[in-house]
Amino acid sequence: MRTEQITAKALKQIGDDRYKLSLIVAKRAEALANGAQALIEGDTSKMKFADIALMEVAEGKIGLEAIVEGK
């Protein structure tokens, strides 16, 4: 799936708020960089942390609630 399609799907998951999406992706990418496990299936070893975070949001595996709670 192309990045534009993933982004559109992620935006739908969080109510079409680009600010919230950027906040979620940035915080989750930071957590992934610090050793958190990816919540998506498949080989993520060659993916950027931001791409993994975006896919997690698009698949509904993570949202703003998890970021606010500090998960």
From Swiss-Prot:
The enzyme's E.C. designation: 2.7.7.6
One term under GO cellular component: DNA-directed RNA polymerase complex
GO process annotations (BP): DNA-templated transcription
Primary enzyme class: transferase
Catalytic activity: RNA(n) + a ribonucleoside 5'-triphosphate = RNA(n+1) + diphosphate
Annotated Pfam families: RNA_pol_Rpb6
Subunit structure, interactors included: The RNAP catalytic core consists of 2 alpha, 1 beta, 1 beta' and 1 omega subunit. When a sigma factor is associated with the core the holoenzyme is formed, which can initiate transcription.
Role according to the record: Promotes RNA polymerase assembly. Latches the N- and C-terminal regions of the beta' subunit thereby facilitating its interaction with the beta and alpha subunits.
Family annotation (NCBIfam families): PRK00392.6-2
Classification via HAMAP family: RNApol_bact_RpoZ
Similarity remark: Belongs to the RNA polymerase subunit omega family.
Name of the molecule in the record: DNA-directed RNA polymerase subunit omega
Taxonomic source organism: Campylobacter curvus (strain 525.92)
